[in-house]
């Protein structure tokens, strides 16, 4: 590739990651305020999306992955928030695909007893603003099966350990990188025997720019 070609000609290639972070990833006070408001609204839309599913199932109205995705898109548009691409709505096995996206032609119906993942994000218009981005799962029924509850408990423990490590580092004046927090989460997951099912990194950075990733 290009990197190998340049190196073959003699120059030493170094990463520009630190330069990019200082120049492009600094948040202004306005960006922080807009991000917090976007997070609040994204959480509200998440609640509305699960209520949309609950209401549809309770009233025997057809509900699908694509239908929920479209509901989320319309709700963000109504609020004047931007998305860079549609939300992820995955049912059962599709919830295990980190980059799954339903379409009008390929969409699974949501039924009683299904496991539903919703990953959604939005921001106030403008690349100077930062996306709010969250992922939630829910069970379409009155009682979550023990097997799924057990896995959720493990994931929640991993999440809490990461937050605890962040707080500890903050109070201690310690700098952390993303891979170190990913390792904290992986250690918990692997410790419970689910290491091979950990198919995606733990989260991603957020900052100003054209995309949520």
What are these regions (language model features)?
Residues 1-213:
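Active-site neighborhoods and metal-handling regions in enzymes and metal-associated proteins
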